[in-house]
Swiss-Prot record:
Belongs to the TAFA family. Expressed in brain. Expressed in LPS-stimulated monocytes and macrophages, especially in polarized M1. The lineage of its organism: Eukaryota, Metazoa, Chordata, Craniata, Vertebrata. It is found in: Secreted. Modulates injury-induced and chemical pain hypersensitivity. Ligand of FPR1, can chemoattract macrophages, promote phagocytosis and increase ROS release. The gene is TAFA4. It holds the Pfam family TAFA. Its main location: secreted. PANTHER family: CHEMOKINE-LIKE PROTEIN TAFA FAMILY MEMBER (PTHR31770), CHEMOKINE-LIKE PROTEIN TAFA-4 (PTHR31770:SF7). The keyword Transmembrane does not apply. One of its GO terms (cellular component) is synaptic vesicle membrane. InterPro entries: Chemokine-like_TAFA, TAFA_chemokine-like. This is Chemokine-like protein TAFA-4. One of its GO terms (biological process) is regulation of membrane potential.
């Protein structure tokens, strides 16, 4: 038969084991949380090679006239004197003067074989080939 003192000692050992296990679990959770935040931070904020752009979000929908509307968010790292633009239907760095003066077709935004025309209000451009027309409006 165990003495009351042994039962107290066994309970304190058991309690200390549980406390130690809880401490180890807490440390592991903190380490895992910190490492996942570190990885997420790098995934969302990685560096882009200078002079290039990448698409970070794409949105696509149809309006009530059954015309498809697309928009995208682009992240660029351009050289001095350059800004985000479009070349051959892809995001790119272009000379800032093209955008400032709204000479959109000077950045060659259309695909090979398409004709570029600046919109009458200078808010963007259209690329056409045959009866197909793609219109791009610039927003900031």
């Amino acid at each position: 038969m165990r003495s009351p003192r042994m039962r107290v000692c066994a309970k304190s050992v058991l309690l200390s084991h549980w406390l130690f296990l809880a401490y180890v679990l807490m440390v592991c959770c903190k380490l895992m949380s910190a490492s996942s935040q570190h990885l997420r931070g790098h995934a969302g904020h990685h560096q882009i090679k200078q002079g290039t752009c990448e698409v970070v979000a794409v949105h696509r929908c149809c309006n009530k006239n059954r015309i498809e509307e697309r928009s995208q968010t682009v992240k660029c790292s351009c050289f001095p004197g350059q800004v985000a633009g479009t070349t051959r239907a892809q995001p790119s760095c272009v000379e800032a003067s093209i955008v400032i003066q709204k000479w959109w077709c000077h950045m060659n935004p259309c695909l090979e074989g398409e004709d570029c025309k600046v919109l009458p209000d200078y808010s963007g451009w259209s690329c056409s080939s045959g009866n197909k027309v793609k219109t791009t409006k610039v927003t900031r």
